[in-house]
């Protein structure tokens, strides 16, 4: 049977011992409601537990761009427009302006408020009153109240929108080199090369062992909603994590996945994760 969100839910129901077969996760049944409520959270939890190879993504984040004072138009006390080389900025990105000699107060980290064209971006910040000649404020433009970190680090980056877990930044696994706080990456580096676990939505790309673990983990959580049997829940716990002289499918899946990486490709924490037995639910 093809791997899909719906088929994973139906597999979980079979593991619970439920005879229902969902035709869609939107089925107006107790089984449909329970699966819809739980499956995405179960998937994200399992993705965070291990650096699964199928879920690793790389992204380069470059917030820096040199601009001249002639490229900057002051719109209001905390809003500017910048003309620049074409980029793929989107609202919510953070960018850093540097080298603006004639309006040094504009240098720093700003948040993208809106994209006016491929080469004109409207940026916003706070706590800079009267930074230049005020222009006409565009009604409806959203002002944000975030900017660079108050101390310790030079730059603040939004986490990738599909991030589940950061593995390394610029090849560094040392947390002193960066921090993850309030959904942002704090770093002194002006360019970030990020390796991270992303939120996999295409079930066909999932490792088959992970897919089996997901169905089992979902079944374990469904027990509280669909059955009063503690025995079934304990049985699924043993099947997933091991115990009672049995080896669970989760430790096996982690071991197989980890065996496909060399130590040179993995950080110390990833190596430990890949071989951890995972004896309890997280």
Q: Which stretches of residues belong to each language-model region?
A:
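Glycine-enriched, solvent-exposed interface loops adjoining structured elements
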Residues: 1-68, 141-282
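Small/polar beta-strand repeat architecture
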Residues: 66-146
């Amino acid at each position: 049977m093809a791997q899909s969100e719906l088929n994973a839910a139906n597999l979980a129901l079979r593991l619970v011992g439920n005879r229902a077969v969902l035709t869609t996760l939107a089925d107006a049944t107790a089984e449909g409601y329970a699966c819809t409520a739980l499956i995405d959270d179960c998937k994200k939890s399992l993705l965070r537990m291990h650096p699964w190879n199928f879920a690793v993504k790389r992204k380069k984040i470059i917030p820096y761009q040199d601009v001249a004072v002639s490229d900057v138009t002051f719109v209001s006390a905390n809003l500017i427009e910048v003309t620049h080389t074409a980029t793929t900025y989107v609202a919510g990105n953070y960018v850093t302006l540097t080298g603006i000699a004639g309006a040094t107060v504009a240098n720093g980290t700003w948040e993208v408020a809106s994209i006016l064209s491929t080469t004109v971006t409207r940026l916003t910040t706070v706590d800079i009153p009267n930074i230049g000649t005020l222009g006409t404020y565009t009604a409806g433009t959203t002002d944000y109240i975030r900017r660079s970190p108050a101390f310790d680090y030079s730059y603040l980056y939004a986490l990738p929108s599909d991030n589940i877990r950061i593995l390394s930044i610029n090849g560094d696994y040392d947390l002193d080199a960066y921090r993850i706080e309030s959904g942002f990456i704090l770093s002194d580096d002006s360019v970030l090369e990020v390796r991270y676990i992303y939120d996999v939505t295409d079930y066909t790309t999932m490792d088959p062992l992970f897919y089996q673990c997901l169905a089992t983990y979902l079944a374990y959580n469904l027990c509280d909603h669909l059955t009063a049997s503690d025995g079934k829940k304990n049985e699924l716990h043993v099947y997933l994590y091991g115990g009672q002289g049995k080896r669970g499918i989760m430790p096996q899946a982690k071991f197989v996945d980890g065996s496909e990486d060399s130590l040179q490709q993995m950080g110390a924490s990833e190596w430990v994760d890949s071989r951890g037995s995972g004896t309890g639910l997280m």
